[in-house]
C-alpha cells in the first residue's frame, strides 16, 4: 500500500513538473513572439503624398490637353482623398501649383490647399514664375509662408528632417532668366546639395524636384540640362535615396541600385492622379511602397483621356502605379 502511494505521488509530481515546464516554454515563446512583433512595429516608417502639376486656374477653359477649367474641382477632390488617409506625415507639391504665374492665381489656390489636414510643402515648377514678372521667388515664398505655418523657409531650395532616419531635400531646378520649359541646377545649389547628402549618409534621403533627372519619355524641350551631372552626384552616395519628380505629367519608376527615381503624373491632365508613398527603414533594407490615387471626378477624367495621345504613356506600367521597391543597405 505504501509502495502504491509513493508511485502515485511520484506520478503526480512528475505531471506537475511537466505542466510547469510546458507553461514556462509557452510563456517564453509568447514573449519572443511579442518581442518580434514589437520589433517589427518599431520600424521607422514615413508616409507622404506627392501631388504634382496641379496647374490651378481660377477661370480656365479646357482648350488644351490640360483640364484647366476643372482644376479647382480636381484639386478639391484630391485634397478630400488625402484627408481621408491616416498617418500622413506631409504632402509635397512638386511644382506647377498654378498654371499662370500671377499673384491673383496664387491667392486663389491657397485657400484650397489650406484645407489639407497635414503639413504641406512645395517645390517650384516652370509655371510658378515668369521672367520679369511680379510674382518673383521672394513674393511667392512670402505668400506661402503667410498661408502655411509649416512652411518657414527663405530659400527656394531647402531641407528638413520629418522624422528620425529621414532627410527631405527640396531642389529648385527651374531656369528663371529665360523663357523655357527646360531645367537646370546651378553650381551653388549643387554644392548645397552635396552638403545635405553628406548629412544624410546614415539616413534615407528623399529628394523632391519638378524637372526630372530621368525623363518618363524623350522631350528635348522639357529636359533637365545637367541631368547627368546631378545624377552622378546623387548616385555617388550609397545610402537609400528616393528622387520624386513631376513636369512630364507621366508615371515612371526607375531604380539604379540604391537610388529610386519616381515620376508622378499631373492632377490637371490625364490620368489626373497623385501618389501616397510609405517608406520603411529596416536594419538591412529600405522599402518604398507606392500607392496610386486617381480623381473621383470620372467625367472630367474621361474627357481628359480623350485629349491626350497614347494615354498609356502617362499612366505607365502597373508596377509604376502601385509597386513595392526594396533598397538593400
Q: How does the language model describe each region?
A:
Residues 50-74, 130-151, 176-185, 215-217, ...:
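Acidic/histidine-rich helix-loop elements
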Residues 50-52, 91-95, 120-126, 206-209, ...:
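Active-site neighborhood of phospho(di)ester-bond hydrolases with catalytic His/Asp-centered motifs
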Residues 107-192, 229, 255-263, 272-278, ...:
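Extended active-site neighborhood of metal-dependent phosphoesterases/phosphodiesterases
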Residues 26-36:
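Bacterial N-terminal signal peptides
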Residues 219-288:
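Conserved beta-sheet core of the metallophosphoesterase superfamily
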Residues 44-50, 56-59, 86-89, 119-121, ...:
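Metal-dependent phosphoester/phosphodiester hydrolase catalytic core
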Residues 40-107:
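N-terminal active-site segment of His-dependent metallophosphoesterases
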Residues 57-60, 99-102, 126-133, 176-180, ...:
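Active-site environment of divalent metal-dependent phosphoester hydrolases
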Amino acid at each position: 500500500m505504501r509502495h502504491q502511494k509513493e508511485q502515485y505521488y511520484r506520478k503526480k509530481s512528475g505531471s506537475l513538473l511537466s505542466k510547469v515546464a510546458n507553461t514556462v516554454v509557452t510563456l517564453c515563446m509568447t514573449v519572443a513572439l511579442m518581442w518580434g512583433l514589437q520589433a517589427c512595429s518599431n520600424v521607422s516608417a514615413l508616409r507622404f503624398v506627392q501631388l504634382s502639376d496641379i496647374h490651378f486656374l481660377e477661370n480656365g477653359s479646357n482648350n488644351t490637353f490640360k483640364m484647366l477649367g476643372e482644376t479647382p474641382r480636381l484639386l478639391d477632390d484630391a485634397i478630400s482623398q488625402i484627408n481621408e488617409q491616416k498617418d500622413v506625415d506631409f504632402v509635397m507639391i512638386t511644382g506647377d501649383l498654378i498654371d499662370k504665374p500671377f499673384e491673383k492665381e496664387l491667392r486663389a489656390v491657397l485657400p484650397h490647399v489650406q484645407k489639407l489636414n497635414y503639413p504641406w510643402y512645395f517645390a517650384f515648377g516652370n509655371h510658378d514664375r515668369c521672367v520679369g514678372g511680379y510674382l518673383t521667388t521672394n513674393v511667392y515664398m512670402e505668400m506661402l509662408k503667410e498661408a502655411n505655418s509649416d512652411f518657414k523657409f527663405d530659400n527656394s531650395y531647402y531641407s528638413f528632417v520629418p522624422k528620425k532616419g529621414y532627410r527631405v531635400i527640396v531642389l529648385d531646378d527651374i531656369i528663371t532668366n529665360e523663357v523655357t520649359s527646360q531645367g537646370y541646377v546651378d553650381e551653388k545649389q549643387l554644392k548645397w546639395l552635396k552638403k545635405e547628402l553628406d548629412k544624410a549618409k546614415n539616413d534615407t534621403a528623399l529628394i523632391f524636384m519638378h524637372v526630372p533627372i530621368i525623363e518618363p519619355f524623350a522631350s528635348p524641350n522639357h529636359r533637365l540640362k545637367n541631368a547627368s551631372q546631378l545624377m552622378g552626384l546623387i548616385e555617388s552616395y550609397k545610402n537609400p535615396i528616393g528622387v520624386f519628380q513631376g513636369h512630364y505629367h507621366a508615371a515612371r519608376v526607375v531604380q539604379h541600385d540604391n537610388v529610386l527615381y519616381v515620376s508622378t503624373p499631373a492632377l490637371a491632365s490625364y490620368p489626373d492622379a497623385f501618389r501616397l508613398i510609405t517608406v520603411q527603414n529596416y536594419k538591412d533594407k529600405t522599402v518604398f511602397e507606392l500607392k496610386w490615387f486617381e480623381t473621383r471626378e470620372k467625367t472630367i477624367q474621361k474627357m481628359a483621356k480623350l485629349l491626350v495621345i497614347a494615354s498609356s504613356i502617362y499612366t505607365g506600367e502597373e508596377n509604376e502605379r502601385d509597386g513595392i521597391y526594396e533598397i538593400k543597405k
